[in-house]
């Protein structure tokens, strides 16, 4: 049986995060907190989109908060590994993921993480402005952005000033050669969506959540590919 609530599939290489994402049925915003993908009551639940964010992952640019359980050693594709994103060494080669949707693949670029009280996980609680996503992402990066990305940005900026201006100009963007190669170099852009992945964690408070932030943009089709 196909579940009409399915809206995407998240996959983060190098982690156990590999699971379907759903939208909760109307009137039951936390249904998948205690029900699996088949609709059966289960402590495992299923990763689901915050009802305040709508019922699609493809209405971009936008803000999308996705919740998933942390099941520890038996995580089975859920969100437990997001708790590890506070560790610089662990996350260093796990900064990208893919969110597959009916509209196409969304490239995820993780750029920040923080631990908050469980009561502070909504859009307004996190100080996210739907009218200024670019500014919101910049504020998040300043508050809890990954240090290695900030260092990379500083190095790229320095390279620009010591001899890479020509390559930068050829791209028509700021940020140096690394920005040229990808078009996204740790900086928020107007076309990006903000994704927030939320899971339980157990470090500071008795009821806390780890939030991992990612910029997301639709993957461009290869040259010559049909749309």
What are these regions (language model features)?
Residues 1-227:
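Solvent-exposed, non-transmembrane regions of membrane-associated and secreted proteins
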């Amino acid at each position: 049986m196909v579940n009409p609530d399915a809206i995407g599939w998240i996959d983060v290489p190098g982690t156990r995060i590999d699971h379907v994402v759903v939208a909760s049925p109307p009137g039951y915003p936390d249904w998948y907190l205690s029900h699996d993908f088949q609709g059966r009551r289960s402590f495992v639940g299923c990763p689901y989109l915050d009802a305040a964010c709508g019922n699609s992952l493809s209405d971009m640019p936008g803000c999308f908060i996705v919740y998933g359980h942390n099941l520890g050693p038996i995580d089975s594709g859920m969100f437990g590994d997001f708790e590890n994103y506070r560790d610089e060494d662990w996350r260093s080669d796990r900064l990208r993921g893919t969110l597959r949707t009916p509209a196409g693949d969304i490239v995820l670029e993780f750029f920040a993480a923080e631990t908050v009280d469980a009561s502070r996980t909504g859009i307004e609680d996190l100080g996210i402005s739907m009218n200024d996503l670019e500014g919101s992402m910049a504020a998040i990066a300043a508050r809890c952005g990954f240090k290695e990305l900030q260092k990379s940005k500083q190095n790229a900026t320095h390279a620009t000033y010591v001899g890479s201006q020509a390559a930068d100009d050829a791209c028509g963007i700021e940020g140096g050669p690394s920005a040229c190669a990808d078009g996204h170099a740790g900086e928020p852009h107007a076309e990006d969506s903000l994704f927030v992945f939320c899971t339980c964690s157990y470090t500071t408070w008795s009821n806390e959540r780890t939030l991992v932030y990612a910029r997301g943009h639709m993957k461009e089709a290869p040259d010559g590919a049909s749309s």
